Amino acid sequence: MVIGVTGKIGTGKSTVCEILKNKYGAHVVNVDRIGHEVLEEVKEKLVELFGGSVLEDGKVNRKKLAGIVFESRENLKKLELLVHPLMKKRVQEIINKTSGLIVIEAALLKRMGLDQLCDHVITVVASRETILKRNREADRRLKFQEDIVPQGIVVANNSTLEDLEKKVEEVMKLVWEKRE
């Protein structure tokens, strides 16, 4: 079974994935980490698109790249057109060779088409205030995540870790019931 976990920056996607890993033995596929690997593989193309300043000591400086791509939708689109197909292919390869419960953690699950690989999708949501408390840099990125709309099962994460664990437990009961 493949479950996608999505939501905006700072909502608690990683925490939900950690709960699924620890309580249910899920294999978590962190799409951000895959993205970091893919960036290194396409660094020459990144220099072509965004200039040499995106490299530092021969490696992609993700902070500089983020500064460039999050200043315009056009730059973000260029980056996504380059890396998303490669990332999706890598996720599909992992799913093909992994058994048991697989969890895909991705803010841009739908935009990347990864939701099509999932049996279920959990969207983690939190208030803007909660998000900004958790992550000071979130404000800049939130405007580029406006298209992340809740899909599948929605889990609100504005409270405690214990509360979130209970909600994830309830979700998993539903998911297992639907499976039978």
From Swiss-Prot:
A cellular component annotation (GO) from this entry: cytoplasm
BP GO annotations: coenzyme A biosynthetic process
UniProt GO molecular function: ATP binding; dephospho-CoA kinase activity
The EC number(s) this enzyme carries: 2.7.1.24
This protein's record includes keyword Protein biosynthesis: no
Keywords of the record: ATP-binding, Coenzyme A biosynthesis, Cytoplasm, Kinase, Nucleotide-binding, Transferase
Domain of life: Bacteria
Cellular localization per UniProt: Cytoplasm
Pathway: Cofactor biosynthesis; coenzyme A biosynthesis; CoA from (R)-pantothenate: step 5/5
Main location: cytoplasm
Entry keyword annotation includes Zinc-finger: no
Domain DPCK residue range list: 2-180
Residues noted as binding ATP in the record, renumbered to the chain: 10-15
Catalytic reaction(s) noted: 3'-dephospho-CoA + ATP = ADP + CoA + H(+)
Family statement: Belongs to the CoaE family.
Function: Catalyzes the phosphorylation of the 3'-hydroxyl group of dephosphocoenzyme A to form coenzyme A.
NCBIfam families: dephospho-CoA kinase (TIGR00152)
Name of the protein in question: Dephospho-CoA kinase
Annotated organism of origin: Thermotoga maritima (strain ATCC 43589 / DSM 3109 / JCM 10099 / NBRC 100826 / MSB8)
Record lineage: Bacteria, Thermotogati, Thermotogota, Thermotogae, Thermotogales
